[in-house]
Amino acid sequence: VEPGSDTQHIIDTGFGNQQTDFKQNQDEEFIAPLAGLKVIDATQGYTGPYVGLMLAEAGAEVIKIEPKGGDWARDLAPRTPTGSSALFESFNRNKDSKTIDWTSKDGQAQLKGLVKDADVFLEDWGPGVAEGYGFGYGTISKENPKLVYLALSAYGEKGPFRDRPTSELVIQGMTGYLRTTG
């Protein structure tokens, strides 16, 4: 075997064929590693939607929950030829999308119905916010003990900076990484 001659096979085997139907070739069907898992992605912007995208790309059924007015990333440039945000479209591909106002009683009931049957719940609402609306891990894991709960926040759920708002650029500056990128 020539060095590098099996590269495509390694890529297809290790990462799956990049086709959305997950078939390696016409004769053999590839079953994605997360096929059969249901993920509720109640995140916005960059980090959370990217996590949801990785799960969707690995075969999970991902349902993106957007607030009334949509994910704020829908307003980001650059735009696709159809006028939508390229970043939003890229990070939210292969997901179903529902608009639910989880701050209202009706919206909370809708979201709880989805989370009850889910395998994974993603939220980036900020420390303590999910608990305030009845979506903290301690509450929803009672109805769904198998649930994997991922709460994303810049500085974690506890600690001196937990309530500080931030962005990726601020974190890069705090860590010194910004010095390497200019």
Predicted regions, residues:
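N-terminal helix-loop segment corresponding to the beta1-alpha1 unit
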Residues: 9-182
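A glycine-rich dinucleotide-binding beta-alpha-beta segment and adjacent secondary-structure elements
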Residues: 1
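Glycine-rich loop-to-alpha-helix module at the N-terminal edge of alpha/beta enzyme cores
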Residues: 4
